[in-house]
Swiss-Prot record:
It is a peripheral membrane protein. The gene is dgkA. Pathway: Lipid metabolism; glycerolipid metabolism. It is found in: Membrane. This is Diacylglycerol kinase A. Optimum pH is 7.0 with 1,2-dioctanoyl-sn-glycerol as a substrate, and 7.4 with 1,2-dihexanoyl-sn-glycerol as a substrate. InterPro entries: ATP-NAD_kinase_N (IPR017438), C1-like_sf (IPR046349), DGK (IPR037607), Diacylglycerol_kin_accessory (IPR000756), Diacylglycerol_kinase_cat_dom (IPR001206), NAD/diacylglycerol_kinase_sf (IPR016064), PE/DAG-bd (IPR002219). Residues 64-123, 699-887 are annotated as: Disordered. SMART domains: C1 (SM00109), DAGKa (SM00045), DAGKc (SM00046). It is an enzyme of class 2 (transferase).
């Protein structure tokens, strides 16, 4: 058994090189005998600083036996001059032995009385190295190689790492730095991320600071005296791993030991909220075995608790089994980070190390080493099953590409994790279209993570549509496969190029090292496909149906892309920018949103056409918009005979391509659910409902039976898709009987009844407006004529809106549009008539029909007596002609 000697063994020394004091950080001046140095721990100090040093000497490197592990020393209470310490000695023949002793320690050298403090200041903490203890205090560092620098110092021998010796190492969790030859001698004092009596005060469960000495990257104010802690060429001053605040060495025994977790307190999971269940690891060192050896550590198949697989410098795998504690210390926005360490070249593993030093290491889940997110998602689900009111306290951050995000969506659905938990993204993939659509940039490139985490903390929550793709072989319809889609689905030309890129990357993954290199390879493979292959015309093999209607595929189209987002292939907007006030585009199509339960369909004619679209030189062919799509692929026998050894066509979902190897197959794309996403607050996403509420969200159960192209109001005979609507209180309420007639499915003409009833109910309300509108022309008319004009004008407005709906027009009023005040009132009345109608997608409008309908509207205004009959007939004919043109 060793007895710790805390006092430094000071000896005067003449330094042959420039040396700085390890206490105050100033240079040791003089030609000779510049200061003192501890002969045991190499602590250098001025003569006047030796009485003020608060760091205790770790001299067991000279007293320990060859096979012993040095005792662990960290911060503890120092309000008195006596403290309880524990030492551990490990023998080669025994697994572990524990001895506890009590020593009288002189905190200050030369019998100087320590400064008293109102706080219980953490100065020295001796870990209880009991192998049977549930809380494993002796926690190993997770070292990885780091660069040499003259400003980096070994926390063990206190010498600079800028030497000719081996590569220095750094702990990825506590930033402890050591030389390669000092690595096996460092104390086991890594940060404890779970509940433990070592770092948690008994009253209230508050967490103490975890101080690491020296190696400050920049100057900050001391949390006690508020004077700057200057960066020094020594191990002077301290930095807390939880709140990242600084503390002077001279203020170490005066500060408040309770940590507030700093600027990231809303997302850091405190150790007091985590209960450690078990710890399992494999080690190569001959130390006390506080954890069980396993030849091949794997995740437990039991879903009882999550496990985290962590790798350290000795190839030791540590699996920690833990659960959340039900207490009041749970932060407002707990963040669980899922990292794909294979994404983004070396950025994945680098992110894990950086995030582990900013958050609780247990919040970081390596999807590759941990075998996926299953265990963590199960733990979250079990906790929320007991506390559903705390769902809004959880957030998820995915570090990876779009494929990683899609994988996490699938696992969340599998483990019944609420889709209301918002998800943020740090993009590490090649295209990163989903991250671009939410304002998180084109890809992570070494930016400051603390600023990114602050942006995640301040992000706004929006809704995004997700879709399910059901596919089957027509010869075996019982064998069906379902894939979730978030970004896009494509078939034909671009999927063939993506498949060639995918096969080349799997064959030589070492050649695809980054986003820029991947895009160059993608271009090269696309040119090879263009030269060596003839892409089949999709009109020969593909049929696209929306409900019972078929969309005609032009003979020139070789690729069809179905979009959910406004970003494709690395940020290309194929559909085009949205118009203000939801106005239709010049081609009659509507705006694109990520939360409108509508997909956009575009086509490309050739590989040069696709390249020009990706370069924003030209635009694709807009084929329409839809909420449910069925694609039938039928390979003619002549094609299979001519090219039996080649892949005729392929499809891809969110950048994951697959060949179509069957003769006849079917794809059915339908709305699945909405998920909550985190959008950068400085970015304006393409969302239709800015104040969406999941509690009032309704999923359309029936597919629309009409052609997909776009406008936001339905044809007049879509009574089966009407949704009940309550008008605002500021507007006149309809009578109960007309409202019942509107919603009744047995009404023979529900749309016309709605129009007539609204005309009757709003007749008096519009009386004054129409009288004002017709003052110049109808001064001599009597009240009866005014009433007739009111009815006719209202009928014109409602029926004209129906005509505009069926032809994708946006006119809301036909009475004196030059008068803004009256126009606004008329628009409000028209909105009341049309808000009761809701459909997920809208048919295309044709230019000739728009002109005809405008002529019909003018005729209706001139012929008031025939409005009711003519408008209804014109609406039905207009919509019938529209469907015939699309067919």
């Amino acid at each position: 058994m060793n007895q710790l000697n805390i006092s430094h063994n000071w000896k005067i020394k003449s330094f042959t090189s420039i040396t700085f004091c390890d206490h105050c950080g100033s240079m040791l001046w003089g030609i000779c005998t510049q200061g003192f140095q501890c002969s045991d721990c190499n602590f250098s100090a001025h003569s006047h600083c030796t009485n003020l040093v608060t760091l205790h000497c770790n001299n067991n490197k000279n007293n320990s036996k060859p096979n012993e592990k040095p005792a662990t020393i960290t911060a503890a209470a120092a309000s008195s001059s006596t403290t309880t310490t524990t030492t551990t000695e490990t023998s080669t023949n025994t697994a572990a032995s524990t001895t506890t002793t009590t020593n009288n320690i002189d905190i200050k050298n030369k019998d100087k009385t320590p400064t008293t403090s109102p706080f219980s200041s953490p100065i020295l903490s001796s870990y209880n190295n009991n192998s049977g203890n549930e809380f494993c205090s002796n926690r190993q560092h997770k070292f990885h190689k780091t660069s040499k620098s003259i400003t980096k110092f070994c926390n063990y021998c206190r010498e600079t790492t800028f030497t000719i010796s081996g590569e220095p190492v750094m702990c990825s969790e506590c930033r402890y730095i050591a030389h390669g030859h000092c690595q096996t001698k460092v104390p086991l004092n890594c940060i404890i991320p779970y509940s433990s009596p070592i770092n948690t005060i008994n009253d209230g469960g508050n967490v103490r600071h975890h101080w690491v000495e020296g190696n400050l990257k920049k100057s900050k104010k001391c949390i006690h005296c508020m004077e700057p802690c200057e960066k020094s060429f020594s191990l002077a001053h301290y930095k807390c791993l939880w709140c990242h605040k600084y503390l002077h060495s001279s203020c170490f025994d005066k500060h408040n030991p309770i940590c507030d977790f700093g600027s990231l307190s809303d997302m850091i999971l405190p150790p007091s909220s985590i209960r450690l269940l078990s710890t399992t690891a494999t080690t190569t060192n001959k130390i006390e075995k506080l954890i069980i050896e396993e030849q091949q550590p794997q995740l437990s198949s039991s879903p009882s608790s999550p496990r985290l697989n962590i790798n350290n410098n000795n190839n030791n795998n540590e699996i920690i089994e833990w659960e959340l504690i039900e207490n009041s210390n749970m932060p407002e926005k707990v963040l669980f980070v899922f990292v794909n360490s294979k994404s983004g070249g070396q950025f994945g593993s680098t992110l894990i190390r950086k995030l582990s030093s900013l958050l609780n290491p247990l919040q970081i889940i390596d999807l590759i080493k941990c075998g996926g997110p299953d265990s963590t998602l199960q733990m979250i689900n079990r906790y929320l099953a007991k506390h559903p009111e705390q769902t809004n306290r959880f957030r998820i951050l995915v570090c990876g590409g779009d494929g990683t995000v899609g994988w996490l969506f699938k696992q969340m659905t599998k483990h019944l994790v609420p889709s209301t938990i918002p998800i943020g993204i740090i993009p590490l993939g090649t295209g990163n279209d989903l991250a671009r659509s939410l304002g998180w940039g084109i890809g992570y490139d070494g930016e400051k993570l603390i600023e990114i985490l602050k942006s995640i903390n301040e992000a706004k929550t929006i809704q995004m549509d997700t879709w399910s793709i059901e596919m089957w072989d027509d010869d075996k319809p019982e064998d069906r496969r379902v894939i979730e889609m978030n970004n896009y689905f494509s078939i034909g030309l671009d999927a063939m190029v993506a498949l060639g890129f995918h096969l080349a990357r799997n064959a030589n993954p070492q050649l695809f090292t980054g986003r820029t290199v991947n895009k160059l390879w993608y271009t090269k493979i696309g040119l090879e496909e263009f030269v060596t292959k003839n892409f089949v015309s999709l009109a020969r093999i593909v049929k696209i149906n929306v409900g019972t209607r078929e969309i005609r595929v032009d003979r020139s189209i070789e690729g069809i892309i179905i979009l959910n987002l406004g970003s494709y292939a690395g940020g290309v907007d194929l559909w085009g920018a949205n118009r203000k006030d939801n106005q239709t585009h010049s081609d009659g199509t509507g705006n694109q949103f990520i939360d409108d339960q509508t997909l956009e369909i575009v086509g490309v004619t050739s590989l040069p056409h696709l390249g020009s679209c990706l370069s924003s030189i030209s635009s694709p062919i807009k084929m329409g918009q839809a909420d449910e799509i069925r694609i039938q692929v039928s390979m003619p026998s002549i094609i299979l005979k001519d090219k039996s050894n080649e892949i005729e066509t392929a499809f891809q979902v969110d950048g994951e391509p697959e060949p179509i190897e069957v003769r006849n197959c079917t794809f059915k794309i339908s709305f699945f659910k909405k998920v909550s996403m985190l959008s950068n607050r400085s970015f304006k996403p393409r969302i239709e409902n800015h104040d969406s509420d999941l509690s009032t969200f309704q999923i359309s159960q029936s597919p629309n039976l009409y052609s997909p192209p776009s406008f936001k109001n339905p044809p007049p005979n879509l009574n089966q898709y009407q949704q009940p609507h309550q008008p605002p209180q500021s507007q006149p309420q309809p009578q109960p009987q007309p409202q019942q007639s509107l919603q009744s499915p047995q009404s023979p003409e529900p749309i016309n009844n709605n129009t007539n009833n609204n005309n009757n109910n709003n007749n008096n309300n519009n009386n004054n407006n129409n009288n004002n509108n017709n003052n110049n022309n109808n001064n001599n008319n009597n009240n009866n004529n005014n009433n007739n004009n009111n009815n006719n004008n209202n009928n014109n407005n409602s029926n004209n809106n129906n005509n505009n709906i069926s032809n994708d027009l946006t006119n809301n009023s036909e009475v004196n549009p030059e008068k803004s005040t009256n126009n606004e009132k008329t628009n409000d009345n028209n909105n009341n008539n049309n808000n009761n109608i809701n459909t997920p997608f809208e048919p295309i409008s044709l230019p000739d029909e728009n002109n005809n309908n405008n002529n019909n509207n003018n005729n209706n205004n001139n012929n008031n007596n025939n409005n009711n009959n003519n408008n209804e007939t014109n609406s039905e004919k207009s919509y019938t002609n529209n469907c015939d043109e699309v067919d």
